[in-house]
């Protein structure tokens, strides 16, 4: 269920390419194969010294979306592959070679890699699934930041955003004397990240919602 929202990225007549490197994330690969299901896909190994032509040859022309699933398991591999995709895209544009829309499916831990060129996230339309995301360009987040800085004199942390969400969802019920508020299973979006609380077989209630983060080449970030 974690990667359920990625399903539509692979639907229809898409050119799907799995890219591996020297170090790969086997667990992520299994999850992506499950999401892709019976849709056909290509596979390529890209490492330092690999001719970029190998990627160029796998790109579909105008009218077909290209979805690259990057399975590299470390920062070096991810950086190498994203740079190669960007280079191939630039080369094809320079040669006026028609290319379908390019999307990259990656991992949420990429945001913790300090040396990645974040502009490539936008250029290559990177998507990943995460348990929490707060984009400071979002209007709601910007408003929260402004009020938080006025009150505390510093920029809020990720824990500040999560704390705000918790108060918005549970504060009213707790103030009314209810230890646990009624949770209907509906999706709640206190700030930007969605939540869906459901009760499992053991009677425990927890958040089952995962957010799909998508960077757009128009320099926007959507979270759903």
Language model features: what each stretch is:
Residues 1-224:
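Extracytosolic ligand-binding ectodomains
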